[in-house]
A protein has these predicted regions:
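Conserved, structured core segments of small domains
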Residues: 1-104
Length: 104
């Protein structure tokens, strides 16, 4: 099975403690539904910076900054996309970027 990096973008932060607990339960249920396909559940990420080839540093996160990541196993891109479609972030307008990890 191939490994896929899921990079989460966007979405909204739950405004209340109750909403945060509901969101965490949804993430837990989603990870649970994927079972052993979850290699590394990952984490949310903070503010991002970009170092450019000219040495300049952009500190605004860019147009679509990452909000988190996970490492998932799937047979192919279609299988990975099918798993990503269950991501709770999608319900709040976010997206999941998929990239196959190349073993070296």
């Amino acid at each position: 099975m191939a490994k896929y990096l899921f990079v989460y973008h966007g979405g909204s932060r739950p405004p209340t403690k109750e909403a945060q607990e509901k969101a965490m339960a949804a993430w837990g249920a989603w990870f649970g539904s994927m079972g052993k396909a979850v290699v590394n559940g990952g984490n949310p990420v903070g503010k991002s910076w970009t170092v450019k080839s000219d040495g300049s540093v952009v500190m605004d996160g860019g147009s679509n900054p990452a909000s988190g990541f996970s490492l998932i196993e799937a047979p192919d891109y279609n299988g990975a996309a099918a798993l990503a479609k269950g991501c709770p972030l999608l319900a709040s307008g976010g997206s999941v970027e998929l990239a196959q990890v190349i073993d070296m």
